[in-house]
């Protein structure tokens, strides 16, 4: 379980890994698009796809090792189990947010997101 302060600290601390994930995601998408066409890319071939996929999984494993729930990678969506007013919640960070500014009850999901006040 995370407090809001702990979730915010982890996002700030892990921002370099999150940025790495975003870069890998972009490289992988570009490489796969190139290889789907004429089959050539300045970024490489199938071996480079496999290497990027391995790097992507490594970053995801790192995030998961902190008990962070990675809900999406395009965009990156991270949930941190916590408690608010006696209820189980997920502190929610979405790619582009400067901080953990949202939460939702576990049973409500993303559609139930509310701003942290």
Name every feature range the model reports, one short phrase each.
Residues 6, 41-44:
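Short amphipathic alpha-helical segments at helix-loop
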Residues 1-36:
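Long, hydrophobic N-terminal alpha-helical segment
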Residues 20, 30, 48, 53, ...:
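Glutamate identity and glutamate-enriched acidic tracts
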Residues 28-31, 35-42, 49, 77-80, ...:
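Short, surface-exposed, charged/polar-biased interaction segments
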Residues 17, 24, 31, 38, ...:
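Amphipathic coiled-coil alpha-helices
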């Amino acid at each position: 379980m995370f407090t809001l302060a702990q979730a915010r600290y982890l996002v700030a601390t892990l921002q370099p890994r999150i940025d790495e994930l975003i870069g890998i995601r972009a490289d992988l998408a570009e490489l796969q698009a190139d290889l789907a066409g004429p089959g050539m890319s300045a970024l490489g071939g199938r071996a480079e796809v496999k290497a990027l996929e391995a790097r992507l999984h490594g970053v995801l494993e790192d995030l998961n090792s902190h008990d962070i729930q990675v809900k999406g990678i395009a965009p990156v969506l991270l949930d941190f189990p916590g408690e608010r007013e006696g209820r189980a919640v997920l502190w929610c960070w979405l790619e582009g947010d400067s901080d953990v500014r949202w939460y939702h009850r576990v049973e409500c999901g993303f559609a139930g997101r509310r701003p942290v006040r």
